[in-house]
Amino acid sequence: MTSLMRKLSRELWQLRGQMLSIALVVATGIMTVVTMRGSYETLVDAQQAYYRDMRFADVWASVKRAPEPLRREIEAMPGVAAVDTRVSFYATLDLEGLDAPAQGHFISLPEHGRPTVNDIRLRSGRYIAPGTSDEVILSENFAHERGLRPGNSIRAVINGRARDLDIVGVAISPEYTYAVPPGSLYPDDKRFGILWMSREVLGPAYDMDGAFNEVMLRLSPDANEDAVIARLDGLLDRYGGLGAYPRAEQPSHLILQGELDQNRVMGTAIPAVFLGVAAFLLNLVLGRLIRTQRGEIAVLKAFGYRDREVGLHYLLFALAAPVLAGADELD
């Protein structure tokens, strides 16, 4: 062992308390990086898998009233991989314990089969039975907040008529991970819920038999999203199209993506604080050590040690804490 290495070992032992403290701060920063980055990547993977399994739409468009045969023209558009149409309306819900009426967003489901775009996942209960007129599936967040479950009933005013509806299932959907009421910026699960109902029942109730007022598209990987939206707007314009928009502007996705982005930013900012504190402490310790050893440095240089060798000695001292922290994380 060289003289400088013996000197380094002696200094590290003498300052073991400070160096161990710095190593713990660095280890905390590294652990935070690994944990939060892993959490972010896991959440993103889960989001993408959920979107893929539920066939989450890439483009939405609302229209006043369009004939169902128009669907074939939309399917023939370049870049479109799948199309689904539906009937969608808002209605007042008669619920106890509220000082103002609650609102429900009624969305049609095919009576036979499942939606080709924006499917739902049952959490409890069953799917709507064919031929029934008063069965609904409730969004999970709303059902939880209102204490509703399959077997309960709920009263709604649908197109001016009060109807008692039987809750047969509770479901989730990527489209309504966060259900945001119209005119609001944030979800309100106590006053606003999603209710899925048979299209054969909901359509005639709003004079939408053989027609639709909402269309969702999934795009092929090589599709030009802007071009598809422009062409879709052109097709729907004569039927009172209200403007198509991409997934990036879909309210629930926008909120969820914002939370994921916040998670990613925090995964960078918090570790940076720990590592910054560690760097500050290490700078204090190293600076004090160099100031107190000016005489020793002069002696070393007098004995023929070059500036590079002396500098390497103090660099190894500075690296001791991060190396110790890294070794601790590997263990």
Residue ranges and their predicted role:
Residues 1-276, 307-308:
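Membrane transport/envelope proteins' first extracytoplasmic loop
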Residues 13, 20, 301-320:
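Amphipathic cytosolic juxtamembrane alpha-helices at the membrane-cytosol interface
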Residues 151, 304, 329:
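Conserved G/P- and acidic residue-centered "switch" motifs that form tight phosphate/ATP-binding loops
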Residues 276-298, 319-331:
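Small-residue-rich transmembrane alpha-helices
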Residues 18, 22, 267-270, 317, ...:
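Hydrophobic alpha-helical transmembrane segments in multi-pass membrane proteins
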